[in-house]
Amino acid sequence: MTNLWYPKQSPLVGLTGLAGGASSYFVRSATTGAGGDYKIPYSLRFKRTSGSAGTSMLQQLNVAGDPKKFTLSFWYKGGNHQNAGTPAFGGTCIVSAAAGNAGSVHRDYIGFPETDIFTVSANPSGSSWQHNESTRKFRDYGAWYHFVVKVDTANSTANERTVVWVNGERIDMSANISQNTEFAIGKQNYYMNWGRYTGENKDYLMAYLADCQYYDGSALDVSTFGYWSAPHQWTARKPAIQKVNAGITWSNTCTASNGFNSGSPATKGFDGNLGGTDHVLGDYGAGNSRVTFTPPTPIPFSTIRVYGGRDSALKDKNACQINGVNVSDYWSNGDGWKNFTNLPGVTSPLTSISALAKTTGQVAYWMAIEIDGKILVDGATDSTTLSFGNKGSHLKFEDASALGTDSSSNSNNWTPNGVTTTDGWDNDQFRDTPTPYEEIEDDITTVRGNFCTLNNNDRTNAITSSGTASNGDTGIVASSGTWRFIRGNMTLDGGKWYWEYQVPGSTDGSNGWQMGLLSKEFRNTSDQDVNSDAQYYWGRQVTGRYNNNVGGSGAQNGHFDTSPATGAWVMFAYDADAGKMWTGANGVWDTCSGSPNPATGTDPHWTGMPSSGLIPSIGIYGSSLLGKMRNGGNGFAYTPPTGFKPLCNNYLAPTVGIGASHFEAVSYAGDGISGQKVNQYRFSPALVWTKRYNSGAAWWNVFDRNRGVSTDNCLFLNATNAASSRNTQLTSFNDDGWTLGTNGDSNHSDGNFISYAWYGGSSQVTDTVGDVNVSRWTDTTAGISVMYYTGNGNQSCWLGHGLGKVPAFVIVKANGGSYEWIIKHQFNSSDKIFYLGGSSGTDAESTPTGGNQGKIANLDGATTTKLKVEGEGGNLHNVNVNGQAYVMYAFAEIPGFSSFGQYYGRTDFSNAFPFIPCGFTPRFIIGKTRNVGPRDWYIHDSQRDPRDPIGYNERTKCMLPNKSDAEVTQQAIDMVSNGFKIRNTSGGSNGNTNYYVYAAWARNPFKHAIGE
């Protein structure tokens, strides 16, 4: 039996440093649920060449299907649908069918007809549309999404007629399709297309599609096509209907601690009936009767839902549990389906479900349990027959000479239009796929995964202007006399990399090109001229070299001895581990000095480069030029040097594979009852921040393992107050979280709370390398050190942090006395710091003066083992008063898990607001303007807004950690697989020309930007 985490890899590849250990995760085996080592070897690039031309796959079958019932499953990446619906771009249609190409015929549209909202639309009359639109906005151009669209319009339940899942999670849709509506899909002799709008021959797709499946006459659950291989990681499986019911009498293993309520026995929860009082319920008259279902054997699941409800007066948050995890917040009031898929702590397999009945008006119950789309019914046996029906098909795009081949038994082949399969940049068959597997015998053409493309979230100007990515985001169009830069969507963190650019035209007063690497800190704005300021840029223009401002403010003209001609392929080889890079053209490395050879590491053109945080990029200006990048997904023009790899995320090697093993955000509702456990964590926390976010009267609370749970254990982010004893607030640290007391600041019965927690290793140590002893909990894998020390009163004091790397973000606060919170960021100006709580919390960075003297010294002077605090004139209140106790939280940057950077505010183009590359999907972000005040700190997380849906954008719920305010609706952002995108003009996070610093921690690294 082979355990699968990622195809062709061991179960724990890329998942080192699991704080809870590998046993904390369920790994579905190859023999369970027909998952197996399913490979998707190719994708097809769909491109638009004009408003009415591009790539598509066409089919017209003179056979009747079922226009009321069908299922579509496909993987989708990239695309340029952010301004779909505008005259410049039109929509981007994924699949459609129509009676013909006239504008008023029976037709469908599935895709993005209006901006970035996914839509399932039908127009059976030819004149009246029925639209069912997502409430989410799909703005991640670097990740693979898995879509499943289930249509069953005969269903009597309105919201079951069109169901859409994305990456294994059912998403909310805005409306419902009328009962018995006939789609054009499934109609006899109608035209059907992948990649364009059939009804009017327009809206050609600009994206990659893979594994396109169409099941005629079947309404299938998402578990047919995928499963959760790790937290937040949806993985493709060999299509198979999952068998859950197998003649088992489920109610036999359903018990009630004090008996069942009259008329509500265990059988009521497993008879398949919904609604009314047909539910299983404990005897509330007996007091505290908990009904618990324990299956005879644990049930693996991809999706899990419960049809039931609870009374609004039931405040006990231990009342509803799955696998022992409290889920009462999600087991909402009133009858209906409750979705528990992928909640923190709720992982496959299912071992138990329980609901508590306390007294009259305080009960929880269920009517049905659904696993992978199958309701558990006593004695039932599921059919596992999977049929494509009459019109169904399966496009794998494997055969370059016959890309339209149907791999199902139907042989319903498709006709490719506008597709190129000849070798070269124009080849539309890509190895860019959602099932990564490693190269075989050092042959890079055998690797599969998510390849680096150009990032339409991260360009100099508006999407309707020049500088926009095209052709599957491997090209950039220029039609302006101003430089337009665009970065890729993959940060090169360690390793050896090779890629190519094609020279689009001659360089003169009207045209130009630049190629190379830009840092994630590069100021990607329309007024950024690298010829006068090349900071954070390593690249070339003709014979000029850009070297991060070294040797001049812009390019070093004449550095290279060859000038690549129009059409030449410029080569780059970057050894991140050695900090070296080489360039050349058409198979020959430039010989400006010595004998350059990337394979042996000799005579590089750049040295001393960063080992992480750099991104392949193109700069271009001119008249209708097309700059092209080759990432290796469809081959290279020239053979890479030995040991150098294409730009594929499968070669990334993040230290932390799952962010939730070291940092996590969890929301919970208070019940005012001592003993509630916040137990959705995969580790025992060393540092905890909590806040009631639906009230403006609640302070931020800070706990850590060094100070424990008794005396002076709670500090307040938003205030300078000394610590208070809050042993009725947090009563214990546990292996999977902590236990709450009755204090309303963390457990108010009407409160909604957010908690952020960091892992700090398995034990406390005493660090003696500095001037005073430091007690600390340190997670060196994830760059987290939770420290506690007593000041010695000296003007400078070294403190051991134990990170093994130089810290990039440090917070310190006196535990006693009304002293400031001090924050030092690696991008603070020299000798300057930030304040957090109190009246100074809105200040721009400053040099401490007067009573606020005392600071964290510049971090470029810190070492991998210790850092320094210092002051002047004997005034050290904030950092080192003799005999005063202090907490300090120090963080080092770990590529793929944490990022501590800066960005530049800009509001000139709404679609070109700042994009901040992180190399991961952020889980939590805290930021602040650096050079302008007064401005609040801001916090965004992917838990509150809304509660942890995958890929949800935009996020508008912001927290202000320097204030006690409730969450506010402002400072909108998007969180995507490789960073975050600002979506606002607020001075708090995007004042024009302001500089901002941020700290961000990951949910998952970009290596796993597939079904994430």
What is the role of each PLM region?
Residues T2-L15, G20-Y42, T49-S52, S156-A158, ...:
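Extended recognition patches within non-cytosolic domains
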Residues N3-L4, F70-N80, Y145, V151, ...:
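Extracellular, beta-strand-rich glycan-interacting domains
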Residues Q9-K68, I117-T119, N123-S128, Q188-Y190, ...:
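Low-complexity, glycine/proline/serine-rich flexible segments
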Residues F26-T49, S73-Q82, V105-T181, Y546, ...:
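Extracellular glycan-interaction surfaces
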Residues R48-F70, S128-F138, T198-N201, G282-D283, ...:
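Short surface loop/edge beta-strand patches of beta-sandwich-type extracellular domains
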Residues G51-T119, S156-A158, S218-S223, L492-D493, ...:
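Extracellular glycan-recognition modules
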Residues N123-S125, I185-L209, S354-G361, T985-G987:
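Extracellular glycan-interaction patches encoded by glycine-rich segments
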Residues S387-G389, P416-G424, P434, E438-D442, ...:
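Charged, alpha-helix-forming regions
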